[in-house]
Amino acid sequence: MLWIFGVVVAILTTAYASLLLTSEPVTPRERQVLMEAIQVLDGAGFSREASALRRVASFRRTDNWWNRHVGHPTAYAATNFPFGVITIYPTFFKYPVDEIERATILLHESYHLFGDDEKFALHRVWLAKDRLGWTALRYGRTRLWKNTREWTLAENPRMFTCGEDGQSDCLE
């Protein structure tokens, strides 16, 4: 029985190493931007998520072999569960207007670190948007807001059945 455990550990360790070896780490400047966004999460009361991002995640700037195989053409970031490898794409640095929007992306990825699926992550982030200070009034015209609203609507349509038109955000 112990040998089975040893084989499983060896396979998982090899898989993790292969994800790291086939991708590049973030630069020091990119890491600084990531840490600033994680501080926003801490400040908004997402200490569990921020702690996981600080202590568990291995941030990468290029796709590993698995992400190249699967593809993430519209993503700002991608998480490899259960390994904690988070690929941060150039769009993460290009399109979010500030650290609050980058924190929103990292909050989403933190749910994947815990094994949650895309539908759950989108749902939880949309519920938490006010807590982050990510509001329609301030961010409603940003690319990230529009993308996230579109993706959340596609995965969780019942969150957008309010208002006179029956298609408005029920949290607004």
Predicted ranges, named:
Residues 2-46, 50, 60-82, 116-172:
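Metalloprotease/metallohydrolase-associated module, dominated by Zn2+-dependent proteases
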